[in-house]
């Protein structure tokens, strides 16, 4: 799956950049018929029309490059308010935000953590948990890190 993701980034990033968008991230889910989710961002936000434009361009290139064997579903969307954080650079830009983290392996007895993204040090993200404790994770040991908007 890592090789497929690398190939997809290599194909999709220049397309989104040429169209004036930021490639926020790519997620591939499912087995058999895959769903390829491409998240784009723009300083002025992302509309449904933007997603349609990007989707059409990517589909045309995928038809030629054929990066995915078999059938797949292509979804293009904004990362949204509860955006997934795909890399350490994005994490640095989101310091101070409420986040939810899911680890690949249990830390103590838990894999899910919620708190404020306090800071980034090298490849480590440090969260200030709801109970006031700080915890550090190597970014590569996280299954998922996502912004968790506070609506209170």
Curated annotation (Swiss-Prot):
- Coiled-coil zones: none
The gene name on file is rimP
Q: Which HAMAP family match?
A: RimP
Database matches in Gene3D superfamilies: Ribosome maturation factor RimP, C-terminal domain, RimP-like superfamily, N-terminal
Asked if the Swiss-Prot or TrEMBL record annotates the protein with the keyword Signal, the reply is no
Q: Could you give one GO CC term from the UniProt record?
A: cytosol
Pfam families given in the database record = DUF150_C, RimP_N
Q: Name one GO biological process term.
A: translation
Q: Which family does it belong to?
A: Belongs to the RimP family.
> For this UniProt entry, what is the primary localization, expressed as one broad class?
cytoplasm
Q: Which UniProt keywords apply?
A: Cytoplasm, Ribosome biogenesis
Compartments annotated for it: namely: Cytoplasm
The protein's name: Ribosome maturation factor RimP
Organism of this sequence: Francisella tularensis subsp. tularensis (strain SCHU S4 / Schu 4)
Does the record's keyword annotation contain Cytoplasm? yes
- Functional summary from the UniProt entry: Required for maturation of 30S ribosomal subunits.
What lineage does UniProt assign to this protein's organism?
Answer: Bacteria, Pseudomonadati, Pseudomonadota, Gammaproteobacteria, Thiotrichales
